[in-house]
């Protein structure tokens, strides 16, 4: 979902191992590791931040993550990058600030391991930065250089020019390089280079092509999605669209891929490679007491110094009133990795001192177990008895189940079930155009899914008007209203598909 659409919605396993699309470094971060920290505010030109990011990406791909970026300093309380770095301190070896304010010295330090550089023009409107990042993704030991000064520095260090992408389009770079690019990951970013510094590191790490998805798509983005669809397994799109969310997610869904909103995410090449946290977050799920609302499923509280710690006594567990309606409050946008890495931890949201006063369901990307396990672990450690985590939307990632080709639905079910098990979640939030039973049944068939909340795209997520249904003995509940949104005037059409049995 779009980061700007933060909404509070009101509502009246074991799976076979699935080859997930997320890569890992040959060596994960552990106590023997060393992370060089670089402050991006100390870098004068944003193009040089892209250079550092591409360096960080192939270092993580080659051996182990060795670079982590913060805004100013590692002790900055407002900088979320620095906050997550502090969570790693001690558990993942040495935090080295030698190059904190000297990215040139950082390049000199790693120059002997570089094979070349790719020149780009950050001011190009035709995708020069995306083209250069794609070239670095496809190659080995390459960094992208966007300024004459950085190019000159690299030349002086004995790093040769490998390719000039200053006038190259992102589409041309993709076509020329796709033989050595991933066929399961793609990164979508504006061709004007405005977000190139964010996902460049993870793109290079994952060998992902980088290209724009404009409003309604174009031939270049169609070609990238078609390549994902040609893979044997489901794919994933990182970054975000540049125009129309519905068209973007629909195109990905039809192409057998899901989206992770991550256009402003940074340091994923490091955060996704943690030995102590990765794939170790699943917690035994306990059945709530009889009659307890699904949204109030409890989690064992752990002692922690983070927001929410110690409040399980202050906020008593809510008990339902007999013969009354049950209302569940669910916070949207937890699929947005940028938000989870950023302001979500702060006092306006999960870090609120009032959190825990009432039961709240927090949508949360179950893929966090693979991509940002430290964020998920931090959230769980700080959870009160009134906090529940709900996978989605729409499971493995953001997609429309009714748009997924029939021959891909089992793959989405398997990936969703596996990620829900890894993240310890058993409630699923789905967004779709229409609640078609045949599209939801595969997801509900997963042993990992206990119940499903369905939000319609449009109509304030509430096109089902609070209706409920039972599929395979599992609850499907539709949203009643969205905080701050007008009430829907009509239900979403069923598009001629088999209707849910509405109770």
Enumerate the predicted regions with their spans.
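Catalytic domains of cell-wall/extracellular-matrix polysaccharide-remodeling enzymes
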Residues: 221-224, 236-252, 407-484
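Terminal accessory/targeting
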Residues: 1-364, 368-371, 475-503
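Catalytic alpha-helical scaffold of carbohydrate-active enzymes acting on polysaccharides/glycoconjugates
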Residues: 311-429, 435-454
